[in-house]
From Swiss-Prot:
Protein known as: Meiotically up-regulated gene 128 protein
Job of this protein: Has a role in meiosis.
GO BP terms, alphabetized: meiotic cell cycle
Encoding gene (name): mug128
Superkingdom in the source lineage: Eukaryota
Organism: Schizosaccharomyces pombe (strain 972 / ATCC 24843)
């Protein structure tokens, strides 16, 4: 599953790179990740934490990380090497209007699992973090 996602992102970088294409592709991808996340959240709310096995918790953790990492990959692919800032110029980049919402979704996913990411790391990523820096502070050498 994870290999398929990595392969998809690699392949997608070779496709047409028009703003319209990228914008719709990112929105579709983000929606799917958000649906996955909402499903996990609802599953957790309707399930007693005591009834979940260690392996089930591991799968939830792993999938949450995958959602978060995938959104980071998509945002990075879209913006290239440009620094991702919370208040980047929307006037100059109208197709990018949804990026702040994407980053907000990233934050929601990350903050839902205490101990995975600290708020300081998330804030750093949202305001100043490039992809390379984020990898370093979040310990994602495999990204």
């Amino acid at each position: 599953m994870e290999y398929a996602n990595l392969h998809y992102v690699k392949e997608s970088s070779n496709l047409e790179r028009s703003s319209t294409y990228k914008s719709s592709k990112i929105q579709d991808e983000a929606k799917q990740l958000l649906y996955d996340y909402v499903y996990i959240k609802e599953k957790l709310l309707t399930t007693s934490s005591n009834s979940l096995t260690h392996y089930q918790w591991y799968l939830i953790y792993k999938h949450t990380c995958r959602c978060f990492q995938q959104v980071v990959r998509i945002v990075y692919w879209f913006l290239g090497n440009q620094v991702i800032r919370e208040n980047f110029s929307i006037k100059k980049r109208k197709p990018h209007n949804h990026i702040p919402q994407l980053l907000e979704q990233c934050t929601c996913i990350a903050e839902s699992f205490e101990g995975i990411y600290t708020k300081k790391q998330i804030l750093y990523f949202k305001c100043y973090g490039t992809f390379k820096t984020w990898k370093k502070i979040a310990n994602f050498p495999h990204l």
